[in-house]
Amino acid sequence: MIESVIIGAKRSPIGIKNGKMVGIRPDDLASQVVRGLLEKTKVEPSHVDDLVLGCAFPEGPQGMLMAKGVAILSGLPETVGGSVVNRFCGSSMDAVHQISSRIETGDIEMGIAVGVEDMFSVPMGGFNPDFHPELAEQEYYIGMGETAEIL
């Protein structure tokens, strides 16, 4: 079996409400991180086969297959694929798992997992939530902070 390994990690600063990062597009922020990762690891962009991006609310500035846009903005070749995974708070971890699985099955040799969330551009629940009444009555739709407290 082929083993997958993580050869590098990079992250952006965490923004605060009305802080200095207000107005930076999530795709620009993610592509800066990917460019920094490529620089840090000295990986040639042509060696990257795929990019999977985790995002809990892929709409608005985070929509329209943001992963492919991030790949292009990062300087990866147009041949590099891009997909978005939504597992809410687990989205980025799922992106790591997907890249790892694709490497271990021999589907790709190298991939990048990235996550991004612009909590100021996209409101909790998205732009047009339509919650199921029965689930809403049971308080099914709560944030991860509240969920963690309950668990």
Give the residues covered by each predicted segment.
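Conserved "HGTGT" condensation-loop signature of ketosynthase/thiolase-family condensing enzymes
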Residues: 1-80, 114-151
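Active-site-proximal alpha-helical scaffold in enzymes
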Residues: 85-116
